[in-house]
């Protein structure tokens, strides 16, 4: 366990290189299980979630080689039914559910612990299991374990998701690429990270059309090849540092970004008064306004405003000149950071899924506790703008999704340091 000390009141100025997207890296790493050939992945962020997923794959018999900085080579030519993914890691990682489909396709049977992750609402796995069953899998739930088997090759299906789900869309895509026949998936999540997975699978030999849309068509192939693939930059990390500039009235240049992935965040930041300029194909400069204007924000599936930036924008709205309304439509329990922001002087009232944020002139440093990944960084952002020193505890959450955050902030003259508890 460790904490981060933040001394606020300093405008951030500098340049930050955005890392590879965690939410693309994890499913692409898992996709290596679909082939016996080597998959080389570039632009892989150094995060605890990535390390945990690689550890799970090693336990399944995958050969993992660190080729260089941000590059790994995965070869799943020696997996068998005699594997034992570590329960403690599987249970704490929601993304571990994705290993079910490829292992079932390769081995015909699999048994893993039920997955975990951030304690945010009812992140259920029923949509994943419904998709697996539709493809022909037999599923049994017993004592916090999931057992699955398939007596023959999975078959192509026409399937419409009851609700938009990033995770379940990924599970279904991985089933379909090796299933017998054609698959049509409707009401798919359209996140860029899903498209990135599809482009990687296509490079491995998968037959996928409709990438990036709500309707994806896949014709199954008998086997996939190896490939060399680079992960897209992390739009949530980019959005977080954009808020860092806005909340400190600073000026930051971000490199390695994809503008269209940031459209909803850029629109809201401009409405708040920030000035954002595109520099070239993959760089932008954001300059925060002296007076932050209030916003109305509703989280929704991509391409609308992402739930993973809700907490960061709430910190920004805490010092806006007026009243902001933030509505969380994705998860029913993603306001745990609110109580910590209130300790810092924020004026926030929760009404079911809606947060009414009345801006104050200044936040004040306090000892606060991170409850999940995005909450942890929202408290760091609040500390950057606050008067005095903020201590953010339980920063292991941050390590799940932000590569070298302290160092990147320090490069922009932030007074921030990590300390052991």
From Swiss-Prot:
2-(S-cysteinyl)pyruvic acid O-phosphothioketal found at: 118
Organism name: Orientia tsutsugamushi (strain Boryong)
HAMAP family per record: MurA
Catalysis: reaction(s): phosphoenolpyruvate + UDP-N-acetyl-alpha-D-glucosamine = UDP-N-acetyl-3-O-(1-carboxyvinyl)-alpha-D-glucosamine + phosphate
GO cellular component, one term: cytoplasm
Keyword Cell division: yes
Gene that encodes the chain: murA
This protein's pathway: Cell wall biogenesis; peptidoglycan biosynthesis
Role: Cell wall formation. Adds enolpyruvyl to UDP-N-acetylglucosamine.
EC number: 2.5.1.7
GO biological process, one term: regulation of cell shape
Name listed for the protein in its UniProt record: UDP-N-acetylglucosamine 1-carboxyvinyltransferase
Residues binding phosphoenolpyruvate: 22-23
GO molecular function: UDP-N-acetylglucosamine 1-carboxyvinyltransferase activity
Compartments it resides in: Cytoplasm
